[in-house]
């Protein structure tokens, strides 16, 4: 299960409300979603796609966190208050990444192949942020709450804001 103990320690490090490993194991939906993902991912790699997706959907129903079994997730992912988190099929996540509630790591089209973001190590993605497309987010990047990221972010950078622009004129 790719070092459950390490994942529990990460939660204890990052969440001041976490008191002990048993509490984290039994009561933290981010851990439950991650455990289900690890099993679903193993099934997905062995081409048991339907069973993997079924397990993924069960985990989503129970936790409110949707992780596609095809995603590649490193060690020590911490999903805090994970309701509404979506991690797409071709997403790649490095080690010691922190994701808050309402985050989408999603695609921008329906084409096959790599269409979701790649996050480096020690990335923090704030609540409600949307990181979209086959982009690369470097190591040690901070993405602010509700930011919309559509292009690569270099190592050590901070991204904030949701800049929208009008694409049609008023009539």
Curated annotation (Swiss-Prot):
Known EC number: 2.3.1.30
InterPro entries reported in the protein's UniProt record: Hexapep, Hexapep_transf_CS, LbH_SAT, Ser_AcTrfase_N_sf, Ser_O-AcTrfase, Serine_acetyltransferase, Trimer_LpxA-like_sf
Organism domain of life: Bacteria
Keyword Magnesium: no
Molecular function via GO: serine O-acetyltransferase activity
Subcellular location per the Swiss-Prot or TrEMBL entry: Cytoplasm
PROSITE patterns: HEXAPEP_TRANSFERASES
Enzyme class: transferase
Coiled-coil blocks: none
Gene3D superfamilies: Hexapeptide repeat proteins, serine acetyltransferase, domain 1
Major location category of this protein: cytoplasm
UniProt KW keywords: Acyltransferase, Amino-acid biosynthesis, Cysteine biosynthesis, Cytoplasm, Repeat, Transferase
GO biological process, one term: cysteine biosynthetic process from serine
Biochemical pathway: Amino-acid biosynthesis; L-cysteine biosynthesis; L-cysteine from L-serine: step 1/2
Gene Ontology cellular component list: cytoplasm
Catalyzed reactions per annotation: L-serine + acetyl-CoA = O-acetyl-L-serine + CoA
Keyword Cytoplasm: yes
Stated family: Belongs to the transferase hexapeptide repeat family.
PANTHER family: SERINE ACETYLTRANSFERASE
Protein's recorded name: Serine acetyltransferase
Organism: Helicobacter pylori (strain J99 / ATCC 700824)
